[in-house]
Amino acid sequence: MPRFCYSRSGALLLALLLQTSIDVWSWCLESSQCQDLTTESNLLACIRACKLDLSLETPVFPGNGDEQPLTENPRKYVMGHFRWDRFGPRNSSSAGSAAQRRAEEEAVWGDGSPEPSPREGKRSYSMEHFRWGKPVGKKRRPVKVYPNVAENESAEAFPLEFKRELEGERPLGLEQVLESDAEKDDGPYRVEHFRWSNPPKDKRYGGFMTSEKSQTPLVTLFKNAIIKNAHKKGQ
């Protein structure tokens, strides 16, 4: 009974193993190791021989459990599910992609327009996806308004007769103010209305050196004092 069970299970295993290849089936039938399948050792030896021959004749590809050749191209299967590593006519080689890129550039610039320099191309491509990466154009400068231009325009707008009338109607106080301003423009500007400006001569040093005696040199004062003291001692 156990021998019958062993032989039956061995026959089933052998049938499943030999289903994959008809050539191996015929070779196993003709092999001397598979002639007697009554014992367990002969059965295992036949299975090993058939399995070894199957692995040598039929290549085993990774990823298929039935040990059959892949139906699709292995090169396409390797990284085809990634967007940046697809194999194709455009990205098959670096030389092909460079040639195609060069042909596209020639088609774009074929109308006679000057081709941009590589530095400009790099500058436009390097940071164009950032808002602050684009090269800044000319800065807008504020418009300067010159008072002389406004005066000239007003002078052109008024005739000569009206200008004479306006000059004759000027008050006296305004003329004096204008004259004083003109004098100030000629000389140096003094900050007289501030406290830290130069004080008048009569108020310098607290009024100590305002008299004529104060203008005498200090050596003369000491000399006079010494002479007076000597004269008093001599009396």
Curated annotation (Swiss-Prot):
Biased composition (Low complexity): 90-100
Protein localization: Secreted
Tissue: ACTH and MSH are produced by the pituitary gland.
Sugar attachment sites: 91, 152
Propiece span(s): 103-121
PTM comment: Specific enzymatic cleavages at paired basic residues yield the different active peptides.
Domain of life: Eukaryota
Entry keyword Nucleotidyltransferase: no
Phosphoserine carried by residues: 154
Database matches in Pfam families: ACTH_domain, NPP, Op_neuropeptide
Gene Ontology molecular function: G protein-coupled receptor binding; hormone activity; type 1 melanocortin receptor binding; type 3 melanocortin receptor binding; type 4 melanocortin receptor binding
UniProt modified residues of type Phenylalanine amide: 87
InterPro entries named in the record: Mcrtin_ACTH_cent (IPR013531), Melanocortin_N (IPR013593), Opioid_neuropept (IPR013532), PMOC (IPR001941), POMC-derived_peptides (IPR050878)
Signal peptide: 1-26
Entry-annotated residues carrying N-acetylserine: 124
Annotated Basic and acidic residues bias: 117-126, 185-205
Residue positions where Valine amide is found in the record: 136
UniProt keyword annotations, A-Z: Acetylation, Amidation, Cleavage on pair of basic residues, Endorphin, Glycoprotein, Hormone, Phosphoprotein, Secreted, Signal
Gene Ontology biological-process entries: calcium-mediated signaling; cell-cell signaling; cellular pigmentation; generation of precursor metabolites and energy; glucose homeostasis; negative regulation of tumor necrosis factor production; neuropeptide signaling pathway; positive regulation of adenylate cyclase-activating G protein-coupled receptor signaling pathway
Residue ranges of the region described as Disordered: 88-126, 179-210
Family label: Belongs to the POMC family.
PANTHER family: PRO-OPIOMELANOCORTIN
Protein name (database record): Pro-opiomelanocortin
Gene label: Pomc
